[in-house]
Amino acid sequence: MAFRLEFYRTVAGSEPALEYIRDQVKSHRAKIGRALQYLEDTGHLARRPQVDYLGNDIYERRVAIDQHQHRLLYFFHGRSVIVVTSGLLKNEGKVPQSVIERARKYRVDWLKRIGGER
């Protein structure tokens, strides 16, 4: 099944995940791009260690580059759309709950504006 990757956009027009990616050095952007392509190619079939479920319909795509642990948070919209909400550089431990909560709020906003589950 083909998946389509989209980036969450706030009402004000900012795209937190794209902004995070653009802020990275070129070599990291390239690897993050390949990681997102993998996610688009595999969708629900992607498994650990590449992805993990964080709860409340939020997942993370893990991207390890040298000593850097990038995380891209996303959710599924219907059967074919993956919405990437935000990114972060994880230093240690779990993804902070505040970051997961923000991704969950982005999901609620997306569903409200786009029209619920498809």
Regions picked out by a protein language model, each given a short descriptive name:
Residues 1-69, 78-82, 88-118:
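Basic, Lys/Arg-enriched alpha-helical interface segments
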